[in-house]
């Protein structure tokens, strides 16, 4: 019997990953592995190619909601959930890498980072950034998704994670999906409440920052609360 010698182009994506390493796979091949199966009309590789052609770039995966993912050809609810989970896991891995030992030197530094992270979000996200004595990031924690109004009377969760991380300082950030960053009365009330609560526990609340896609508002820079 003669052995058939296979090259990269003749191997299936999983076989190619094992033999040559994940770095050698194309976007299409990686997506095909995640999809696992095709549909009645298309083989999984054809389906992966078609989906990628429907997107302007890979970054669009991060922007699509669960419902929008299901509108892509060949993507049902289960595959949409799996893709959404994959994107979020990648996002968290990248965040963990980029956050490690970063020292916060200004509100603008935080705002720039969070504009990139939250600028395209369609719901309000309330995030607390916990810092050590050198203002290095210990943890970035999503406290709430929905409306900051629900969190105004309940700063205890923010402070719970501050104590758990033994943080000496924290910065609170939330986004306005409208892109407009002027603070509302609720934003001002929330800022005063979290500042008082932090002072009571001896934790330094450095700022509350509101971000949109292209602008931000810093209470430390523009108000007398801090």
Swiss-Prot record:
SUPFAM superfamilies in UniProt: RuvA domain 2-like
Regions annotated as coiled coil: none
Record key words, sorted: Hydrolase, Metal-binding, Metalloprotease, Protease, Zinc
Motif (JAMM motif): 174-187
InterPro entries: MPN (IPR037518), RadC_JAB (IPR025657), RuvA_2-like (IPR010994), UPF0758 (IPR001405), UPF0758_CS (IPR020891), UPF0758_N (IPR046778)
Superkingdom assignment: Bacteria
The MPN domain, residue ranges: 103-225
Record Pfam families: RadC, UPF0758_N
Keyword Transmembrane found: no
GO terms under biological process: proteolysis
GO molecular function: metal ion binding; metallopeptidase activity
UniProt binding sites for Zn(2+): 174, 176, 187
Protein family (similarity comment): Belongs to the UPF0758 family.
Protein name, entry field: UPF0758 protein SUB0843
Lineage: Bacteria, Bacillati, Bacillota, Bacilli, Lactobacillales
